[in-house]
């Protein structure tokens, strides 16, 4: 009897420990459209007008459509990021290379995407760094808060998307 009770306690403790270790992750999958009224874009910010996220256990594929420059055609960019911290290289602005990583918060409620892009212009190299924090709001919307640092300074943009 005492041995059975000990086993039950052990199983309960292991179950509790593993459930907190593998916290339920926010469900980011879906086709999302920018809600400009709820977003805080700033004067020169360029947020994606639509985002498609395909989330799996070990990776997420993100497709963004952003407005073209000076009324040009919209630009589409797709990247697949793994959750193991591996650096993924993709094409950035005007042929530059973007290096990105993705990592879940300990509670699984936010996904943090960190990126670095290097530009060459007039023989000089500039670096642009950004950190995106993805989460689902209480009312089921996608929130992407982007903090960026470039030669022009620092900025924070909050984009809110609806399905």
Feature locations, PLM:
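Intrinsically disordered, low-complexity regions enriched for glutamine and histidine
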Residues: 1, 22-23
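Bacterial N-terminal signal peptides that target proteins for export
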Residues: 1-10
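Bacterial N-terminal signal peptides
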Residues: 9-20
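Hydrophobic small-molecule pocket/channel-lining residues, especially in calycin-type beta-barrels
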Residues: 23-163
């Amino acid at each position: 009897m005492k041995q059975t009770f000990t086993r039950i306690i052990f199983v309960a403790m292991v179950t509790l420990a593993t459930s907190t270790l593998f916290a339920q992750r926010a469900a980011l999958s879906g086709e999302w459209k920018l809600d400009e009224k709820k977003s805080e874009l700033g004067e020169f910010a360029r947020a994606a007008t639509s985002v498609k996220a395909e989330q799996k256990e070990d990776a997420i594929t993100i497709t963004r459509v952003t407005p073209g420059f000076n009324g040009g055609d919209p630009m589409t960019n797709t990247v697949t990021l793994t959750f193991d911290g591996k650096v993924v290289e993709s094409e950035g602005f005007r042929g530059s290379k973007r290096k990105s990583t993705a990592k879940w918060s300990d509670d699984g409620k936010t996904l943090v995407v960190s990126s670095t892009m290097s530009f060459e212009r007039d023989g000089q190299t500039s670096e642009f760094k950004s950190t995106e924090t993805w989460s689902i709001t209480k009312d089921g919307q996608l929130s992407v808060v982007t903090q960026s640092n470039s030669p022009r300074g620092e900025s924070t943009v909050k984009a809110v998307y609806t399905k």
